[in-house]
Amino acid sequence: MFGGAHELSIDSKGRLAVPAKFRDILSRLYTPAVVVTLESKHKLLMYPVAEWEKVAAQLLNLKVADNPVLRRFQNLLLHNAEILEWDSAGRVLVSAGLRKRVDFDREVVLVGRANRLELWGREQWEAEMVQALDDDPDELAFQLSQTDLQL
């Protein structure tokens, strides 16, 4: 399971140094490669290949014929998926194609989220954290009461 947030920089060649903590999990539990794809203009998703295969199968099974929003989302994730392997320095090369689609460039936060990693622009990540911390606790408690989640 991935967890934690790491402030990093993408270098001028598009390389991102993956923290040793994440590389270790990938090496021990998966393969030393990730599939990176575009989720929105604010973040990229990075999955171990085995986890991505599960997600891709679910995406392909979506009923999208009469739902253009879901079809576009399905296409966004599947069409932009790329396999990345790290080099001897523990870096992955984020393609120019993916980098031009997101609204961040160099300063990023790589976040562990259970079965995947998320790559956010630092400003977008900070804004997301501020919003989460500013959410009304009573509204959150109500929303959580409507789920099966037990913390």
UniProtKB/Swiss-Prot annotation:
Record-annotated disulphide pairs: none
A GO term, aspect molecular function: transcription cis-regulatory region binding
Location of the protein in the cell: Cytoplasm, Nucleoid
Transmembrane segments: none
Keywords, alphabetical: Cytoplasm, DNA-binding, Repeat, Transcription, Transcription regulation
Main subcellular localisation: cytoplasm
GO biological process: negative regulation of DNA-templated transcription initiation
Domain SpoVT-AbrB intervals: 5-51, 81-124
Keyword Cytoplasm in record: yes
Family: Belongs to the MraZ family.
Subunit structure, interactors included: Forms oligomers.
Protein name, UniProt field: Transcriptional regulator MraZ
The organism of origin for this protein: Neisseria meningitidis serogroup B (strain ATCC BAA-335 / MC58)
